[in-house]
């Protein structure tokens, strides 16, 4: 399986006004280069680049986007890549330890640990996501973590880091 230090960093380029910069995270789900990230990480991007921990950089093509679940599927032109295994998110319990891997504030390949605080949450005031059942965690999730995996202690992905709820936004 994939080690936490092998989580890719996703960069995008837009014509204007935003320039190049690490804006999200993602994770490989197959040896032939399929990557999961958040829709909001890649939506509207003119070019998407994925950097692996070994510093190889790949251009990525968007295969599919799902705005209601905030999921994007990307494809790299590569083979024999390490990839994650999925766990059972339904089996996650409140109090379970979890680990988020991502690039908060552009600090690539960072890890943060915490516990599952609640299950079945919706996002207050956001009708687009109110029907989605989210896992709430106290793991430090910041800008740049979006699209990265949430691992259980067995090393399986049980969630995708998507958004934070705070009084400061």
Question: Where in the sequence are the language-model features?
Answer:
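Serine-dependent protease modules
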Residues: 1-169
